[in-house]
Amino acid sequence: MKLNLSSKIVLNQIPEEFYHPATAIERSEITRFEKVPTDIFPTIEEGAIDIANQLEEGIKKAAQEGRKFIMGIGSGSSLTPIFQELIKRYEAGELSFKDVVIFNAYEYFPLNAENVNRSINQLKGCFLNHIDIKAENIYTPDGTLPQDEVQEYCRQYEHLIKELGGMDVILLGIGRMGNIATNEPGSSLTSTSRLILIDETAREEMKMSFGSQETVPPCSITMGIETILSARKIFLTAWGEEKADIIKKTVEGKVTDAVPASFLQTHNDAHVVIDLPAAAKLTRIQHPWLVASCKWTDKLVRSALVWLCQITGKPILKLTNKDYNENGLSELLALYGSAYNANIKIFNDLQHTITGWPGGKPNADDTYRPERANPYPKRIIVFSPHPDDDVISMGGTLRRLVQQGHDVHVAYETSGNIAVGDEEVVRFMHFINGFNQLFGNEQDEIIKEKYKEIKTFLQSKKEGDIDSQDVRIIKGLIRRGEARTASTFNQIPLDHVHFLDLPFYESGKIEKLPMGEADVNIVRNLISTIQPHQIYVAGDLADPHGTHRKCTDAVLAALDMEKEAKAEWLKDCRVWMYRGAWAEWEIENIEMCVPISPEELRAKRNSILKHQSQMESAPFLGNDERLFWQRSEDRNRGTAELYDKLGLACYEAMEAFVEYKV
């Protein structure tokens, strides 16, 4: 069973010479915009192996010289693959850590020693407890100290690092704002170990470990920028497209305290190690024509022309030979013969992505349409990771599919219960208790007992506590009720609304259980029963909580099993990926774009508003202060505006899709 097929999705095939150049000259040419040596790998595993190789070499060299290897490390999730690779080598007898000294880069403050979320406890759990490092060789800032003793402790911590000869290497991840260790934007180049306040953005990232933002300690004791730069070698790692923007600022931007990681540009042996998704915004990956000759695919040509339109402020059909020549795209003139020919080609390609018939237009020529005309009507399943992702991400298309006569099913993959606030439970419990008093003559003792039990639990609940099973069930029921209301509003029969309640989600915590066979079998059973002609799945693979990726992996695994079983229905099924909750598709990747009128956009907003528990009081709105309906409308309007600026038809809004080839 293949449980990670989403990681195999490659929208843009990057030629190897742009991330793994064969010679030093080629590397120098394609990295001309980069100010920190940056190594890009196709997968996280390959990047982790590369760093582990260099660490192993350093550890063994230090042992041969009869000295200890001094290593600074952080505790972010981006370092876990490297730790796993090092553990594997220790278990295979290839590497020993007896002569390695570890300095923890930061610790939360104040936090008691037993708390599992302490940085050092996380490091022990994922790395240190699995190797043969001596306990006396592990040093960490102390988050249990009285505050008035912290400054002196930091001074001693700095002194100890220097006394042992300084760090041979420090291994760090990077935060969304460019923070390294917990040095936030504004940190000085000359800063040393100190107590600092954790800002809101960093707290948002840390809540994945702590369960909620409120339980993240207010401060941390961190190595300073000067301390980090004192290491003889620095590795900075990042994986995934959600880190692409900050990696570009770190590697290609100017040195600024607004991006603390950019200070690595001043170090003589700093290395950024990333995977292809994290490298997506670097010039050699996003705009390769600016650094070398390209193998021009249709997608790359489309990307180049959209970029050219944006920097010239012109629509596609007004681009001239001069525009191409002045902006590094003369190769396209040689390829197409003239700007006119290239313009027409890409204009037509984009025009053909637009359709008002997402299920296919019956009895019409579908040669240039993204979806086939037949069969009609189609059986369709829209998979929604949470009970509101369907309307947030493709509410206009969903409504259009129903109105155009297709047999539409919606499958809500998870209960979404942890995203419901406690006050919603209290409100519904008041209603149930009141209903019992009014119409049941208070005869139902179960309701009375449960009311008291749940009320007592919520009153005594502390920040970070996991909800009881009863509370999670009620929260799930609230989400189900909202999903049914929205589906009814969109004219979807309730017998076409399926609640899958995939088991991986039911951990009661932000961090979910591993997605496995039980999840896939639930999805496969639904798919094989309905045998759809169209499937819609979430393509927001960088969502901050990981639920979308796991849900999509479950669907793709189920489809792969059906393919292996040679299911006949699969030959006439297309799979479309949507986005919208956290990001939008890049225009070069869009294969179907559905226009939305002002009235349809209003209806989409109303269907999102049916999910009342996900408005202002929802626990996990992320860093974006806009409500989900506002984010959705802004993205849909942004897509329409981009098409308009390129010289195509002007619509109120548009929803975009990319096809997944089974």
What are these regions (language model features)?
Residues A63-A92:
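Glycine-rich N-terminal segment of FAD-binding domains in flavoprotein oxidoreductases
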